[in-house]
C-alpha cells in the first residue's frame, strides 16, 4: 500500500469515528436513561454497541403514559463496525414485552431493510423511532384516547360545514342568476358594438360559444346542464328523495343525444352535434351533482335569432326564407324518423341576416328531452314528483308539434317586434287572398292545423320568389314565376345563391327526392327565337359534360312567366297584414303623358318592347356599380380594359343602334368614374350583335330617339323597393339600401325622359304601346355544392402553408380542365369563385356561361356541332366575336374576369387575329394556384396590383412560399411561372401538368389505380398479379440507366483495388486467430424475407429490397447474422461457434447499385448459463483480431449493457415510441468519431425526449475509464434513485453480468491486450433493433490526425457487437423445435473495409509497398516477329514447365515491340520476372528489376528458380497456427485459410519451404534423424532491472517455447543447434532484423541496423538484444556445429528464423 492510500484510509477512519461520536450525543439527548453502551475497554475507542429500551409513543394517550398503561416494550440492540456508517450495522431485538414472535420477526425484518436502504448514513435514531411507531400501532386504544377525540372533533367540524353550506346555497344560486343576467347583457352589448376580442368565449342564453383552434371558422355552442341537490341540515328530517327514475331517464337522454352526434351527412339547415359529455360527480341519495355538456358546431359568422330578429322581421322575403328553410330542415328530420321537439327563437341561427340569409336550426332532438329532464328533477327535489307510467308519444303527434311550433315561431316574430307596422287583423275572406295577400297569416294558420309537412310544402307562401327586388312573386326578369310551372310545382325555393349578367342561380329542394339542387335561370328574348337558341346552347354544352370534377348537369327546361301589367304599392301585403291607420303610403309610379305609368313602360321594355335583353334591375346594377366598388374579381367589359370609353366611342361611330345614344351618354359623360368598373356581360354589345345579324329588319332600323330615351330611363333605374343589390364583385350578393346618389340619378333620368318624350310626341314611334308578350326563362338544373367556393376557402386561410391540400385541389382542377379541353371546349372564366367544394372534399368546376369551343379544333371534334355552327351564348352575342379562318367557331376576346384573363385576351383583335386556345384556362389556373399558395389577399388594391403584376411581368412576390420548405416553395414558384408565360405556346397543357412527375399531385384516378393495384398485388396466385410481374420484368431498361447503374462502383473498385488485396490478407489473419479459438466457418444463404431485414435494420441505413418472379419481397443481407439466426432456429442448434466473411448491402441515395461492404461476422450460441464465458471469449477474440490487423494503433474498448439503458428509460417513464427514438440517438452518439459535449448531446436528445429528460440522462451515468469498481459504485448510486422495482432488477442483473464477463476477460487477456484502454459506459448503444439483450461492446481505433496542431485523431469504429437473444424469439416458428434449456446468442461484426482502409493508410505513411514481394511471379510474352507469328507454342511450353515447378506464371498473348511497355502492367500485377520469347530458336529475354539478358529456355528457368529460392529464403520466417508452421509466402485469400483442416490439425510445410531449407539440410525426401526440442537453447533476453523477475519464470518460458516449436525443429538435422532468443520487442522490429541481417553479417552492419531501430523505436530497449545477438554470432563463428538462430516473442508466440 502506498503512502497516499494510507493517508486516505486514515482520513476515512477518522471521519467514521467522528460521525459515530456525534450520533452518540444525539442518542444520549433523546434516550438518556434508556440507552446503555457496551464497551470492553473504556479508555480505548470502540464502535458503537448499544442497547435501547423502547416503548410506544406517548401521543397515543391523552396525557402521555404516567401510569404506565402501555405494556409493550422491547430492547433494540445495534452493533456497528469501524466502517459504520459506510457499512450497515447489525440489528437485533431483545426482551420483547407484549409482542408475539410473529410481530417481533416482522419488526426485525423492517429494521434490517431500513439498514440496507440507509447504508452510508447514520441510522440508529431512525431505527429507534421506527420501533416506537411499530409499538404505537400495536398498542390497544383505551377509552378516552386522543384518537377518539380526533374523530369526534372531525364529526363536529363536518356538521358545521354542512350547515354553513346549506345556509349559503340559496344565496349562491341567487348570485349566480344575477351574474348570468349581467353576463348576457354584456354579451349583447359586445355583439352590437362589435368590440369582441378574437378567440373570446361568448355566452348566449346561458350557453357558451367556444372557438375551435383546430377547426378554423368553426365554433362550438356548448349547453351546460348542472343538476345539484343537497339534503336538509338534519338528515333525519324528511323522507329521502328517490332519484332512481331521474337517473334512468338521464341515461336514456344521454344515449339519445349520443346517437345524434354520430349522424353523418346532416341536412344543411340543421346544426351538427359535436359531442355530449356526462359527468356524475355525486349520485348518493343525500347529494346529487351531475353535469351534462352538449356541444354543437356553428359558424363564426352566425348569430342567434334572439339577437337579430328585429332585422329579420322587417323584411318579408327573409321571413319567407326562414319558413322555407325550416320546412326543409323539418322534412329531413321527419323522413329520418326524428323530430325537433323544441323549435323556438333560441334554436334559430342565421348568417349575415342582411346578406346571405342562411338559417340553421339547432337543438333538434335534445332540447325537449332535456327540459323534461329538468322538470322531473325539480319535481323530485320539491317532493312533487309522482311516479306514473308515461304513455309514449306517437310519432304522428310529435311531428304535428314541430309544425305547430314553426307557426308559433313565425307568429311570435311578428307580434314581438317593437314598432312593427303590422297588425294581426283577420284578412277578409272575400276576394282573392293571394291578391289581398294574407299569405303569411294563412301559412301560420296552416302550420297550426297541418297534419304532415307535405301540406305546407304546397303552400302559396313558399312559392313566392325569395328575391330582393320586391315583396311579391315577381322575378327580376319582368315577370312572376307561375305557381303551376315546374320550378314551383316540383321544388321549394330556399334562397338565391348568386346573380350576374346572365340571370341568377337559386337553391331549391326537390319535393320528390328531398335533394338540394342549384337552378340557373336565364331570361329568353321573347322577340328572337334565333337568339333564344343561342342562349340555350349553354344547356346543350352542359348536357355533354360528365366528369367527377365538373358540376353535374341534371335537366333543363323553358318556362313561361306571368306578365306584369300593374303593380300594387302596398309594401306589406305579402305578410298577410292590413295597413295600420296613419301609416305612410308609398306614392304611385310616375305617369307618362300618354296616361300610362312609368312602370308600364318599363314592363313593356322588359317584355320585348325594347331590343335589349338586359332586365331593368340588372341594367341599374351594371350602370350604377360605381356606388360600391370592391377590389375583388370582376368580369371585364366587352371593350378594352385599357380604354373602355374610347373603344365604346369607336363602336358607336361605326354603327347606329337603339342603345347607341345610351352608351354614348353613359360612357362619354362618366369621365370621372373608375375605368375598371365592369360587369359580367355587356348586354348592349349583345344587342349590337343581334342587330348585325338581323339587319334586314327595317322596323328596328327606324326606331326614333324617343324610344332611345325611354330605354335610357329603363336602363338607369331599378325597382324602388329593392333590398338586394349586386356588388361589383361577381361572387357577392349583398343586402343594401339604395343610395341617395342613385335616387338622384334616377330622378334626373325621369325628368330628362319626360322632356324628350314631350318634344318628340309627333314622332311615329314615340310612345306606341307594344302588346304585352309573355316573358320566358331558361332553367338549368345543376348539382349543388354544399360546402363553399374556393374563393371562400382561400380567404379563410385553409390553403396557406398547406401544400398537400393545395396540390390536391389543383390536381382535381386540372383533371376537370383536361376533360373540357379534350372535348375541344374552353371555360374562359376559371377563378376561385367558379371552383366549388363539396362536403366530401371534392372539387368541381362550374359556371359555364362563358364556355366556348376551341377554334383550332376540327369540326369532327366539336361537341354538339350538328346542332348549329354557333357556340356559346356570349360568343354569339358579343360585337367582338372573331371568326377564325377556316373555322365556323366565333371567339369573343373581351370576356372572363379581368384579374384572371390571359394576356392574349387583351390584344386588339384587329392587330392580333390569331385565335386563342385552351391555354387561356391554363393561365387562369396558374393565377388560382398562386392565390392558394400565397397568403390570403384582402379585397383591396393590394390584391389587384399583385395579380396584375403576375400578368404584366410575371412578378411573383418575394414572400411567396415563405412558410414552406425551400424545395416545395421553389417547385410552386416554378410551376406558377410556367403557367403564366405570356407566350401561350410556352405554357404547359393540363395533361402535361398532370403527368409531371415533379408535382406531388394525387388525383382521383391515381387513387383508383392504387386501389386496383393493391387488390392485384394481394392476390399473389391471381392471373393479373402474374401479368403485372411479367410486365415489370420484361420492361426494357433504358441504355442510360443500364450504364449508370454500376459505373460508380466499377470505378471505385479500380481505384481502391489494393484495399481488396488487404481485405484478403485480413481474412487470412482473422482465420488464424479464429481457428485457434475453435470457431468454425459456416456459410449461410444470402437472401432473406423483407420482414427479417427490417426488424434488424440499422439506424442510418435501409436494407436492399428486391422482388422475385413470384412477387415475394426479399432483401439482401445488411449483416451476416440474420440468416445465421434463421439457420439456428430451423436446425435447433444448441451450441456453435462460427465465423463468416461476406459482403453486406444497403440502399444508396441514387437509383444505382446497392452499397457493398466487407464484413467479418463472429457469433456463438449456447445455453444462457454459459453466456458470461461466451461473451468474455468474444471480447478476447475481438481484441486479438484488432491488435493483429492494426499493429501499433491505439485502441479503446467500450463496454456497456442494454439493461442499464432500459433501466434509465423506465426511470424516465418514456413511452415505446420515444424509447425507440432515444435508442437511435444513443446509437448515433456511440458510433460517433469523437466524444460529444453535454451541449451536443442535449441538442441531439432534446427533440426526441424533451429538454428535462435529456438533461437527466446526460448527467445520469458518466462513463468511467479502466476502473470497473468505480463504475460499479456509480451504478449503485443510480440504483438508489430508482423508484421502480423492475428498473432495480434490471440494474442488478446488468452489474452481475458485467462483473463476471469483465473478470473472465481480464484473466484471459495477454500483455498486448492489456494495452487496450477500457471505457465502461452505461449508455453504449449499437444497432438497438439487433443488440438489445445484454452485453454491448465496441472497439474504436484512433486514426492519426491530419491537422498539425491536433495531437488526438479521430476515433473510428472498427468492431461492434453484443447479445441478441430476442432475434431467436423473433425468427422462431411454431414448427421449430425448442429445447427446454433457454439459449443465448452473441456476436460481433468487423468492418473489414474500414480496417483495410486504416491499414492502407498505415502502409502509405510507413512507405510499405502495396503488395510485398514475398513470392515469385513470372510474365511470359513474345516479341514481334517478321513473319507476324505469335510464338504461342513456345510461350505455353515455357509456361508449362514453370507451372509444373509450382511457380506462378501468366501468358501475355499479344506480341510486344518493347518490354518497357509492360512496365505499368508489371507494377500493378507485382511481376518479378518477364520472360520474352525472342525467336523460334527458343532464345528468351529474361528481365528483372535489375537486369535484362538473352539466354536459352533452360537458363531462363534456372534464373527464375534462383529468384524463387532467394525470395523463399527471406520468407521462411514463420509464425505458428494450430501448432505447426505456415510459410509466410502463402498467397492471401481463402485458398490459404486452411479452412478444410480440422482445428488443431498441423499443416505440413509447403514445397517452397522444404526447398528453402535445402541449404541447411539434405535435399533427399527422407531424413534419417531430425532435430528435437533438445536441440533448443532458450536464451532469455531482458534488461538488467527485470533480470531477476524474468529468471523466476525461466522454466515456464522454456516449456512454452518447446511446446510451440516441436514441429518446427523437426525440419533440421539432429546436429543443428537452435539458438532461441526470447525477447519482448515488437514484432515489426523482429521482422526488420531478420530481413536485413544474416548469420554472416559484420558487427558494423549489425550496429548500424540497431542504431536505426533505436532511433525509430526510442521507447523500445534494444540494447540487451544487440548484446546477446553479438554473443550468439561470435559463438557461431568460433564453433564448427550447424547453428540456427530464432527470435521468439513470448507474449504471442511470434517467431522468425534468421537465414
UniProtKB/Swiss-Prot annotation:
Q: For this UniProt entry, which segments traverse the membrane? A: none
Provide the residue span(s) of the region labelled Disordered: 572-615, 632-725
Acidic residues bias: start-end ranges:
669-706
Q: Which residues bind ATP?
A: 114-122, 154, 497-505, 520
Q: Which domain of life is it from?
A: Eukaryota
Compositionally biased region (Polar residues):
711-720
Which reaction(s) does the protein catalyse, per the Swiss-Prot or TrEMBL entry? L-seryl-[protein] + ATP = O-phospho-L-seryl-[protein] + ADP + H(+); L-threonyl-[protein] + ATP = O-phospho-L-threonyl-[protein] + ADP + H(+)
Question: What family is reported?
Answer: Belongs to the protein kinase superfamily. Ser/Thr protein kinase family. GCN2 subfamily.
Q: What is the designated name of this protein?
A: Eukaryotic translation initiation factor 2-alpha kinase gcn-2
Q: What is the lineage of its organism?
A: Eukaryota, Metazoa, Ecdysozoa, Nematoda, Chromadorea
Amino acid at each position: 500500500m502506498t503512502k497516499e492510500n494510507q493517508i486516505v484510509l486514515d482520513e476515512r477512519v477518522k471521519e467514521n469515528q467522528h460521525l459515530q461520536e456525534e450520533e452518540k450525543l444525539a442518542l444520549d439527548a433523546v434516550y438518556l436513561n434508556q440507552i446503555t453502551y457496551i464497551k470492553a475497554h473504556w479508555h480505548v475507542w470502540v464502535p458503537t454497541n448499544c442497547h435501547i429500551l423502547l416503548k410506544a409513543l406517548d401521543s397515543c394517550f391523552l396525557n402521555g403514559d404516567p401510569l404506565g398503561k402501555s405494556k409493550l416494550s422491547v430492547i433494540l440492540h445495534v452493533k456497528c463496525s469501524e466502517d459504520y456508517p459506510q457499512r450497515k450495522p447489525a440489528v437485533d431485538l431483545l426482551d420483547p414485552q407484549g409482542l408475539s414472535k410473529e410481530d417481533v420477526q416482522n419488526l426485525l425484518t423492517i429494521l434490517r431493510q431500513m439498514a440496507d436502504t440507509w447504508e452510508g448514513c447514520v441510522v440508529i435514531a431512525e431505527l429507534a423511532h421506527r420501533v416506537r411507531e411499530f409499538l404505537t400501532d400495536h398498542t390497544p386504544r383505551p377509552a378516552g384516547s386522543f384518537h377518539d377525540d380526533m374523530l369526534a372533533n372531525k364529526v363536529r367540524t363536518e356538521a358545521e360545514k354542512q350547515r354553513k353550506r346549506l345556509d349559503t346555497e340559496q344565496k349562491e344560486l341567487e348570485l349566480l342568476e344575477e351574474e348570468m343576467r349581467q353576463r348576457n347583457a354584456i354579451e349583447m352589448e359586445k355583439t352590437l358594438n362589435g368590440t369582441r376580442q378574437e378567440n373570446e368565449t361568448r355566452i348566449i342564453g346561458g350557453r357558451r360559444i367556444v372557438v375551435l383552434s383546430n377547426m378554423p371558422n368553426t365554433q362550438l355552442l356548448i349547453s351546460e346542464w348542472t343538476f345539484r341537490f343537497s339534503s336538509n341540515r338534519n338528515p333525519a328530517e324528511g323522507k329521502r328523495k328517490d332519484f332512481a327514475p331521474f337517473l334512468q331517464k338521464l341515461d336514456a337522454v344521454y344515449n339519445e343525444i349520443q346517437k345524434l352526434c354520430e349522424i353523418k351527412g346532416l341536412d344543411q339547415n340543421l346544426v351538427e352535434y359535436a359531442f355530449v359529455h356526462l359527468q356524475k360527480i355525486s349520485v348518493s341519495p343525500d347529494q346529487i351533482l351531475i353535469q351534462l355538456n352538449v356541444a354543437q358546431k356553428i359558424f363564426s359568422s352566425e348569430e342567434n335569432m334572439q339577437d337579430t330578429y328585429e332585422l329579420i322581421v322587417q323584411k318579408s322575403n327573409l321571413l319567407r326564407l326562414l319558413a322555407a328553410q325550416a320546412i326543409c330542415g323539418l322534412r329531413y328530420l321527419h323522413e329520418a324518423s326524428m323530430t325537433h321537439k323544441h323549435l323556438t327563437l333560441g334554436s334559430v341561427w342565421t348568417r349575415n341576416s342582411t346578406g346571405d340569409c342562411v338559417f340553421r336550426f339547432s337543438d333538434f332532438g335534445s332540447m325537449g328531452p332535456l327540459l323534461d329532464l329538468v322538470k322531473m328533477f325539480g319535481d323530485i327535489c320539491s317532493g312533487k314528483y309522482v311516479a306514473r307510467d308515461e304513455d309514449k308519444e306517437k310519432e304522428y303527434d310529435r311531428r304535428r308539434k314541430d309544425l305547430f311550433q314553426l307557426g308559433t315561431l313565425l307568429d311570435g316574430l311578428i307580434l314581438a317586434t317593437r314598432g312593427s307596422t303590422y297588425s294581426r287583423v283577420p284578412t277578409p275572406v272575400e276576394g282573392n287572398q293571394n291578391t289581398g295577400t294574407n299569405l303569411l297569416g294563412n301559412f301560420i294558420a296552416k302550420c297550426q292545423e297541418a297534419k304532415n309537412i307535405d301540406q305546407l310544402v304546397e303552400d302559396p307562401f313558399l312559392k313566392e320568389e325569395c328575391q330582393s327586388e320586391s315583396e311579391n312573386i315577381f322575378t327580376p326578369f319582368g315577370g312572376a314565376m307561375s305557381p303551376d310551372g315546374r320550378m314551383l310545382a316540383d321544388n321549394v325555393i330556399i334562397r338565391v345563391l348568386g346573380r350576374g349578367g346572365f340571370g341568377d342561380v337559386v337553391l331549391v329542394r326537390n319535393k320528390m327526392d328531398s335533394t338540394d339542387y342549384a337552378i340557373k335561370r336565364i331570361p329568353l328574348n321573347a322577340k328572337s327565337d334565333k337568339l333564344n337558341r343561342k342562349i340555350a346552347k349553354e344547356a346543350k354544352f352542359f348536357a355533354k359534360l360528365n366528369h367527377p370534377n365538373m358540376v353535374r348537369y341534371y335537366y333543363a327546361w323553358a318556362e313561361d312567366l306571368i306578365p306584369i301589367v300593374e303593380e300594387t304599392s302596398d309594401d306589406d301585403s305579402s305578410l298577410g297584414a292590413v295597413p295600420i291607420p296613419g301609416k305612410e303610403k308609398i306614392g304611385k309610379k310616375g305617369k307618362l303623358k300618354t296616361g300610362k305609368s312609368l312602370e308600364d313602360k318599363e314592363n313593356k321594355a322588359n317584355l320585348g318592347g325594347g331590343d335589349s335583353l338586359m332586365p331593368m334591375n340588372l341594367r341599374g346594377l351594371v350602370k350604377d356599380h360605381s356606388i360600391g366598388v370592391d377590389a375583388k374579381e370582376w368580369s371585364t367589359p366587352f371593350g378594352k380594359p385599357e380604354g373602355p370609353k374610347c373603344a365604346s366611342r369607336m363602336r358607336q361611330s361605326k354603327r347606329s343602334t337603339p342603345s347607341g345614344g345610351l352608351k354614348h351618354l353613359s360612357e362619354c359623360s362618366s369621365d370621372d368614374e373608375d375605368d375598371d368598373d365592369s360587369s359580367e356581360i355587356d348586354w348592349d354589345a349583345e344587342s349590337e350583335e343581334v342587330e348585325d345579324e338581323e339587319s334586314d329588319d327595317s322596323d328596328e332600323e327606324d326606331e326614333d330617339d324617343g324610344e332611345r330615351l325611354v330605354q335610357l330611363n329603363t336602363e338607369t333605374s331599378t325597382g324602388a323597393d329593392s333590398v338586394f343589390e349586386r356588388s361589383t364583385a361577381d361572387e357577392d350578393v349583398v343586402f343594401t339600401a339604395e343610395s341617395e346618389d342613385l335616387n338622384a340619378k334616377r330622378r334626373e333620368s325621369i325628368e330628362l325622359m319626360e322632356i324628350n318624350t314631350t318634344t318628340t310626341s309627333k314622332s311615329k314611334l314615340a310612345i306606341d304601346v307594344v302588346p304585352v308578350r309573355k316573358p320566358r326563362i331558361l332553367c338549368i338544373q345543376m348539382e349543388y355544392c354544399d360546402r363553399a367556393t374556393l374563393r371562400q376557402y382561400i380567404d379563410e386561410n385553409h390553403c396557406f402553408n398547406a401544400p398537400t391540400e393545395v396540390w390536391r385541389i389543383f390536381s382535381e382542377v386540372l383533371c376537370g380542365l383536361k376533360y373540357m379541353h379534350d372535348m375541344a371546349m374552353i371555360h374562359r372564366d376559371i377563378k376561385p369563385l367558379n371552383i366549388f367544394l363539396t362536403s366530401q372534399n371534392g372539387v368541381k368546376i362550374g359556371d359555364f356561361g362563358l364556355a366556348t369551343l376551341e377554334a383550332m379544333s376540327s369540326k369532327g371534334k366539336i361537341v354538339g356541332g350538328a346542332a348549329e355552327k354557333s357556340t356559346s351564348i356570349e360568343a354569339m352575342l358579343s360585337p367582338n366575336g372573331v371568326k377564325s379562318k377556316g373555322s365556323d367557331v366565333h371567339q369573343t376576346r373581351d370576356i372572363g374576369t379581368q384579374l384572371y384573363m390571359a394576356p392574349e385576351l387583351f390584344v386588339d383583335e384587329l392587330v392580333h387575329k390569331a385565335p386563342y386556345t385552351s391555354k387561356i384556362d391554363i393561365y387562369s389556373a396558374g393565377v388560382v394556384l398562386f392565390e392558394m399558395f400565397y397568403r390570403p389577399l384582402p379585397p383591396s388594391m393590394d390584391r389587384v396590383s399583385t395579380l396584375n403584376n403576375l400578368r404584366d411581368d410575371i412578378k411573383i412576390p418575394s414572400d411567396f412560399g415563405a412558410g414552406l420548405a425551400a424545395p416545395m416553395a421553389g417547385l410552386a414558384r416554378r410551376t406558377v411561372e410556367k403557367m403564366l408565360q405570356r407566350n401561350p405556346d410556352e405554357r404547359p397543357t393540363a395533361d402535361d401538368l398532370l403527368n409531371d412527375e415533379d408535382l406531388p399531385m394525387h388525383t382521383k384516378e391515381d387513387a383508383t389505380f392504387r386501389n386496383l393495384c393493391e387488390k392485384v398485388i394481394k392476390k399473389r396466385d391471381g392471373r393479373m398479379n402474374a401479368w403485372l410481374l411479367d410486365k415489370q420484368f420484361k420492361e426494357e431498361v433504358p441504355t442510360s440507366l443500364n450504364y449508370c447503374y454500376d459505373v460508380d462502383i466499377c470505378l471505385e473498385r479500380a481505384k481502391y483495388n489494393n484495399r481488396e488485396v488487404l481485405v484478403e490478407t485480413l481474412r487470412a489473419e482473422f482465420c488464424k486467430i479464429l481457428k485457434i479459438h475453435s470457431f468454425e466457418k459456416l456459410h449461410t444463404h444470402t437472401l432473406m424475407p423483407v420482414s427479417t431485414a427490417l426488424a434488424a435494420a440499422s439506424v442510418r441505413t435501409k436494407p436492399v429490397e428486391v422482388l422475385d418472379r413470384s412477387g415475394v419481397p426479399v432483401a439482401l443481407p445488411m449483416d451476416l447474422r440474420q440468416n445465421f439466426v434463421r439457420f439456428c432456429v430451423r436446425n435447433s442448434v444448441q451450441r456453435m461457434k462460427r465465423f463468416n466473411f461476406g459482403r453486406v448491402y444497403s440502399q444508396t441515395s441514387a437509383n444505382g447499385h446497392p452499397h457493398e461492404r466487407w464484413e467479418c461476422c463472429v457469433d456463438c450460441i449456447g445455453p444462457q448459463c454459459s453466456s458470461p464465458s461466451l461473451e468474455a471469449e468474444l471480447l478476447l477474440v475481438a481484441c486479438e483480431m484488432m491488435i493483429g490487423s492494426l499493429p501499433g494503433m491505439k485502441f479503446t474498448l467500450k463496454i456497456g449493457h442494454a439493461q442499464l439503458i432500459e433501466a434509465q428509460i423506465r426511470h424516465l417513464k418514456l413511452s415505446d415510441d420515444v424509447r425507440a427514438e432515444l435508442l437511435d440517438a444513443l446509437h448515433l452518439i456511440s458510433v460517433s468519431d469523437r466524444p460529444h459535449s453535454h451541449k451536443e448531446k442535449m441538442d441531439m436528445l432534446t427533440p426526441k425526449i424533451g429538454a428535462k429528460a435529456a438533461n437527466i440522462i446526460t448527467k445520469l451515468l458518466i462513463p468511467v475509464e479502466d476502473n470497473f469498481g468505480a463504475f460499479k459504485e456509480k451504478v449503485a448510486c443510480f440504483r438508489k434513485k430508482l423508484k421502480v422495482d423492475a428498473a432495480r432488477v434490471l440494474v442488478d442483473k446488468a452489474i452481475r453480468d458485467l462483473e463476471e464477463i469483465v473478470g473472465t476477460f481480464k484473466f484471459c487477456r495477454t500483455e498486448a491486450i492489456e494495452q487496450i484502454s477500457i471505457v465502461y459506459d452505461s449508455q453504449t448503444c449499437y444497432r438497438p433493433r439487433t443488440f438489445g439483450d445484454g452485453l454491448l461492446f465496441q472497439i474504436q481505433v484512433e486514426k492519426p490526425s491530419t491537422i498539425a496542431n491536433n495531437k488526438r485523431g479521430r476515433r473510428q469504429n472498427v468492431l461492434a457487437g453484443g447479445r441478441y437473444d430476442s432475434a431467436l424469439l423473433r425468427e422462431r416458428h411454431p414448427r421449430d423445435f425448442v429445447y427446454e434449456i433457454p439459449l443465448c446468442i452473441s456476436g460481433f461484426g468487423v468492418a473489414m473495409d474500414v480496417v483495410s482502409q486504416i491499414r492502407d493508410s498505415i502502409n502509405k505513411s510507413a512507405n510499405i509497398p502495396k503488395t510485398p514481394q514475398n513470392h515469385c511471379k513470372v510474365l511470359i510474352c513474345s516479341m514481334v516477329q517478321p513473319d507476324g507469328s505469335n510464338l504461342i507454342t513456345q510461350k505455353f511450353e515455357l509456361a508449362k514447365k514453370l507451372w509444373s515447378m509450382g511457380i506462378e506464371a501468366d501468358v501475355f498473348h499479344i506480341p510486344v515491340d518493347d518490354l518497357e511497355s509492360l512496365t505499368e502492367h508489371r507494377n500493378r500485377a507485382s511481376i518479378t520476372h518477364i520472360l520474352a520469347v525472342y525467336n523460334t530458336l527458343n532464345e528468351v529475354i529474361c528481365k528483372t528489376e535489375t537486369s535484362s539478358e538473352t539466354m536459352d529456355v533452360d537458363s531462363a528457368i534456372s534464373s527464375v528458380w534462383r529468384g524463387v529460392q532467394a525470395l523463399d529464403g527471406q520468407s521462411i520466417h514463420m509464425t505458428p497456427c494450430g501448432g505447426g508452421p505456415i510459410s509466410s509466402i502463402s498467397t492471401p485469400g481463402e485458398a490459404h485459410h486452411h479452412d478444410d483442416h480440422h482445428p488443431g490439425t498441423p499443416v505440413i510445410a509447403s514445397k517452397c519451404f522444404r526447398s528453402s531449407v535445402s541449404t541447411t539440410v539434405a535435399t533427399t525426401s527422407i531424413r534419417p534423424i531430425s532435430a528435437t526440442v533438445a536441440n533448443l537453447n532458450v536464451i532469455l533476453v531482458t534488461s538488467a532491472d527485470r533480470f531477476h523477475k524474468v529468471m523466476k519464470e525461466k522454466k515456464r518460458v522454456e516449456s512454452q517455447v518447446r511446446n510451440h516449436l516441436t514441429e518446427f525443429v523437426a525440419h533440421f538435422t539432429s546436429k543443428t543447434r537452435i539458438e532461441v532468443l526470447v525477447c519482448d520487442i515488437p514484432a515489426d522490429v523482429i521482422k526488420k532484423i531478420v530481413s536485413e541481417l544474416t548469420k554472416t553479417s559484420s558487427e558494423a552492419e549489425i550496429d548500424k541496423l540497431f542504431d536505426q531501430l533505436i532511433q525509430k523505436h526510442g521507447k523500445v530497449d534494444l540494447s540487451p538484444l544487440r548484446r546477446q545477438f553479438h554473443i550468439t554470432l561470435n559463438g557461431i563463428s568460433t564453433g564448427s556445429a550447424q547453428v540456427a538462430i530464432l527470435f521468439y516473442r513470448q507474449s504471442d508466440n511470434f517467431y522468425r528464423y534468421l537465414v
